[in-house]
Swiss-Prot record:
This is Protein translocase subunit SecD. It comes from the Bacteria. One of its GO terms (cellular component) is plasma membrane. Part of the Sec protein translocase complex. Interacts with the SecYEG preprotein conducting channel. SecDF uses the proton motive force (PMF) to complete protein translocation after the ATP-dependent function of SecA. It is a multi-pass membrane protein. Belongs to the SecD/SecF family. SecD subfamily. NCBIfam families: 2A0604s01, secD. InterPro entries: Acrflvin-R (IPR001036), SecD (IPR005791), SecD/SecF_arch_bac (IPR022813), SecD_1st (IPR048631), SecD_SecF_C (IPR048634), SecD_SecF_C_bact (IPR055344), SecDF_P1_head (IPR054384). The chain crosses the membrane at residues 9-29, 361-381, 384-404, 406-426, 452-474, 486-506. One of its GO terms (biological process) is protein transport by the Sec complex. Forms a complex with SecF. Part of the essential Sec protein translocation apparatus which comprises SecA, SecYEG and auxiliary proteins SecDF-YajC and YidC. It comes from Rickettsia conorii (strain ATCC VR-613 / Malish 7).
Amino acid sequence: MQKLPKWKIFLSIICTVFAVICALPNFMQVNSKFLPHDSVNLGLDLRGGAHLLLDVDFDTYLNDSMENLADTLRKNFREDKIGYKNLLVRQNSIQLEVRSPEKLKPLKKIINKIDPEIIAEVNENKIKLSYSESRLNDLLNKVVDQSIEIVRMRVDSTGTKEPTLQKQGDKHILLQVPGEENPSYLKNILGKTAKLTFHLVDENANIEEAVKGHVPVGSMLVKGDNASHGEYYVVIKKKVVLGGDQLTTASASFDQNSQAVVAFSFNNLGSKIFGEITKNNIGKRLAIVLDNKLLSAPTINGAIMGGSGIITGNFTVESANELALLLRAGSLPAPLKIIEERSIGPNLGADSIESGKKAGLIGFIAVCIFMVWSYGVLGLFANIALSLALLYILALLSLFQATLTLPGIAGIILTMGMAVDANVLIYERIKEELHKGVSTLYAIRTGFESAFATILDANLTTLIVAFLLYIFGVGAIKGFAVALTIGIISSMFSAIIITKLLIDIWVQYFKPKKLGLV
């Protein structure tokens, strides 16, 4: 009598129990802290939600970079006493004229020291500065990658929305948020760069003249809005004395008058700079500006060394929370433009789920009937293995929090057919051996061994295709690839391990005279 392999028994029991535990949250609420709580994460086409395609405005970023570079050049030229004129930023490049041709060589040294990737085109005493192609590509990739991470933090600040974020092309970002019922909220928080800066107010400027367009050199006019004064203007110094990148926390709060404010605190470096600014400018006003819009310009009454403060403004509780979220996530390196928008209602998702359930159930029942009709008791074992394979798939999807989409359901249904195909192949090989007149045990062992290589090859080639689909596909294609991969692994395990174990138990303990295959 052939002994049952204990490792197969233990492995099958452990895998099945573990799968039941992982799949349980899909059918009931689990309150135990020792058990998994995550159910299958449904995709946009099943839950409904928002679909946005974003364009990263790289030209604006590049123009800002050139403006910063121009300021750096002016400072270095002054320090090295290099005469120049007509220094302008035009079409993502810097153009200037050198007063003395002998200054071209030291000027190039300064440029190379600032950034060796800057290309200088010289025409007599005129110079055009621009980034090299490789530098532009590096900057573009950096900006898009930073934008993706900041969008993720803004959209999913609590870590519960599970958005899908993917880079498409050179400067497009695909954003899908399942279950999002308010696309306008998404557009609002993504439409703001959220660049927070602190400036000293130009106390000597004439507001009326500035509004007419006569703004002093080195200053700029910004507009504010509050409940008591309505719209108003303030002239501030262009120089940024402190940036929002030094913030560590930001949260909505209330002041002593129960007005909504945003409380913030700086990191160590920011606290030190903030302390120096407030210490050296007592009696002056410090403007807090967000995306070139004035939030507030309070008077500095004393040195603030603790590195924290509040931003007042015409805030509601909602707008204060929104601003705090934007500040925590950080400013976008470049503005984002929404070039495609789709909203999928939950009813459509529910219809898709219902259609997927019906298709899967009908397919499962049809396969079960066919297997029992064709292979009798062995067909029943194949059906049990198929049921366990579906359980394993559900458990793995829940465990890894893979997103299940409508194409993913199609992938699972496809693996059902592949699982049955493996069993059919095994049973046909067993049938061939029985026709040779060999014993039942020998026919079973030989049938599984001879079919194993074919099953492995077929599933490995499908796994390779699934891997390539996942690497090069986007959205629903990735969902199909994930479900197909999990389905193949589960179906192979159930067909080779579970089915063989069930047949061995049946043959050993019930000793059937015939397998019902001939």
